[in-house]
């Protein structure tokens, strides 16, 4: 059974986040947590929080054992771009 956790509106570029996501895909939960703890990227704390949420969902909702869990699928997509104002002459 798959357990799902979603993070939306994350202020990290998808390109930077994919570098970290590729490191933990297919790893056991404990190994993925240690990788995220020692990876000096801006997306690491956000992904660590997301991983912790997914583990909490699996333990609380489905009574899974933490030692049996691993990251089967994880991906990063581009979100909504905020409109920016470029101050310049418009006429």
Curated annotation (Swiss-Prot):
Please state which protein family the record places this protein in: Belongs to the universal ribosomal protein uL22 family.
Organism superkingdom = Bacteria
High-level lineage? Bacteria, Bacillati, Mycoplasmatota, Mollicutes, Acholeplasmatales
Q: Name one GO biological process term.
A: translation
What does this protein do, in the record's words? This protein binds specifically to 23S rRNA; its binding is stimulated by other ribosomal proteins, e.g. L4, L17, and L20. It is important during the early stages of 50S assembly. It makes multiple contacts with different domains of the 23S rRNA in the assembled 50S subunit and ribosome.
Give the originating organism: Ash yellows phytoplasma
Q: Which UniProt keywords apply?
A: Ribonucleoprotein, Ribosomal protein, RNA-binding, rRNA-binding
The protein's name in its UniProt record = Large ribosomal subunit protein uL22
Q: How does it assemble?
A: Part of the 50S ribosomal subunit.
Task: Note the InterPro entries from the entry.
Answer: Ribosomal_uL22 (IPR001063), Ribosomal_uL22_bac/chlpt-type (IPR005727), Ribosomal_uL22_bac/org-type (IPR047867), Ribosomal_uL22_sf (IPR036394)
User: Is the keyword rRNA-binding assigned to this protein?
Assistant: yes
Q: Which GO terms describe its molecular function?
A: rRNA binding; structural constituent of ribosome
One cellular component (GO) term of this entry: cytosolic large ribosomal subunit
* Pfam families per UniProt: Ribosomal_L22
């Amino acid at each position: 059974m798959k357990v799902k956790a979603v993070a939306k509106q994350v202020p990290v570029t998808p390109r930077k986040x994919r570098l970290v996501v590729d490191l933990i895909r297919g790893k056991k939960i404990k190994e993925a947590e240690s990788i995220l703890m020692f990876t000096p990227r801006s997306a690491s704390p956000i992904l660590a929080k997301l991983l912790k949420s997914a583990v909490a969902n699996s333990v609380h909702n489905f009574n899974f054992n933490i030692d049996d869990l691993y990251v089967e699928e994880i991906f990063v997509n581009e979100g909504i771009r905020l409109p920016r104002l470029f101050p310049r002459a418009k006429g």
